[in-house]
A protein has these predicted regions:
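Conserved catalytic cysteine-centered active-site region
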Residues: 49-101, 109-141, 179-205, 237-241, ...
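N-terminal extracellular/periplasmic Venus flytrap/periplasmic-binding protein-like
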Residues: 19, 162-228, 232-238, 316-318
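Short catalytic helix/loop segments, enriched in acidic residues and glycine
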Residues: 12-31, 62, 66
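Active-site-proximal alpha-helical scaffold in enzymes
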Residues: 77-108, 139-173, 213-219, 328-341
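A glycine- and small/hydrophobic-rich beta-loop-beta segment
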Residues: 228-237, 243-307, 314
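Single conserved hydrophobic/aromatic residue that forms the stacking wall/gate
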Residues: 1-7, 11
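Beta-strand segments within the central parallel beta-sheet cores of soluble alpha/beta enzyme folds
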Residues: 37-47, 72-78, 102-106, 158-165, ...
Length: 341
């Protein structure tokens, strides 16, 4: 296995180089023993909309400002999973023997873009030909999924409200959360309607941020820490982009497939998971993840949320103790590694 150690999250209005440098230095400083960036063999950095700032070659641009000049670097683009896959690539580089110490991270600066450019860079992560050009946005996509779920199962919008309230509650303890405030059930329920049935409080914010983790191989990790965080497994899967191609829009088959593989590799089951950071770009996405990861049975995700079983110290599996994307924020390419440790 390969351990990861060190996490830096930044949600401040500053330049991209400054955001990455702060996150990277936070990660370097968090290593228990002396660590220097020249000890890094490779770097993988996730980003989605860097082209929106008319900048390319992201990884090289950022790493040269954090002491990694001359190192092999790569930008990873895989929509909102970009830095999650950067982490997976870093892990595989170590497992293959090509590197001993690797940094994986992500960055996104969305709030300098106009609303139109934001919508464009978000929209191109979906199906452009059949959805984006027809006017379907991601809030609209998830609203359709939510309405179908309510039609098929014993659930209402109130269950999504509970998820929003929970994540804001968890985010109160996260010093780098984008939206760090308590939200009552009534306020979340009566929020501005974005795409029926989803209100403002069902939607994550558009965030600026950077995050990174440092991975080291088994035979060198003792140089850096006596208490590493071990990566036991990593799995991935994909699905159809367009909703009309999916056999069901009330479950995420890619999540189910990846979870099954990851649990098998690690030798565990969903019942063994105490904490889970899941992708709640919209509250309905967390409800789906709760089911698809096996924390609740199919069709019972609403009940899981209703009974606060994902709330800290109240259920068997704490969901999004960081506040999730809803509270911590969603800087696209930086979200994956931001969820890791």
């Amino acid at each position: 296995s390969s351990p990861s150690r060190g996490l830096g999250d930044v949600y401040k209005r500053q330049g991209m180089k400054g955001m990455w440098a702060e996150a990277a230095v936070n990660a370097f400083d968090s290593v228990d023993k002396d660590f220097q960036p020249n000890q890094i063999d490779e770097a993988y950095i996730g980003s989605v909309a860097f082209g929106g700032g008319q900048l390319g070659n992201t990884a090289a641009l950022l790493t040269e400002h954090t002491g990694m000049q001359g190192k092999p670097v790569r930008r990873v683009e895989n929509a909102c999973a970009s830095s999650g896959f950067a982490l997976r690539d870093a892990w595989m580089a170590i497992k293959s023997g090509q590197a001993d110490v690797v940094i994986a991270g992500g960055i996104e600066k969305m709030n300098d873009l106009t609303p139109e450019r934001k919508r464009f860079w978000l929209g191109v992560s979906g199906d452009t030909e059949w959805e984006r050009l027809a006017g379907l946005t991601f809030p609209g996509t998830y609203a359709l999924m939510a309405r179908r779920y309510f039609h098929e199962f014993d659930s209402t919008h109130d269950d999504l409200v509970n998820i929003s309230v929970k994540n804001h509650y968890h985010g109160l303890d996260n010093e780098v959360a984008h939206i760090r405030k308590d939200v009552s059930f009534d306020k979340a329920k009566s929020g501005f309607m974005v795409a029926d049935p989803l209100t403002l409080y069902d939607c994550c914010p558009t965030s600026d941020g950077a995050s990174c983790v440092i991975l080291a191989a088994d035979h060198v990790v003792s140089q850096f820490t006596d208490d590493p965080v071990w990566i036991k497994s990593s799995a991935a899967a994909s699905d159809y982009l367009a909703l009309h191609d999916r056999p069901s829009i009330t479950q995420l088959m890619a999540t189910q497939k990846a979870a099954k593989r990851a649990y098998s590799m690690a030798g565990i089951s969903a019942k063994d998971v105490d904490i889970a950071e899941v992708h709640d770009c919209f509250t309905i996405a967390e409800l789906f993840a709760t089911e698809d990861l096996g924390f609740s049975e199919r069709g019972t995700g609403g009940q899981f949320a209703r009974e606060n079983r994902g709330r800290r110290n109240e259920g068997t599996t704490c969901i999004n103790p960081s506040g999730g994307l809803k509270s911590k924020g969603h800087p696209l390419g930086a979200t994956g590694t931001g969820q890791t440790v």
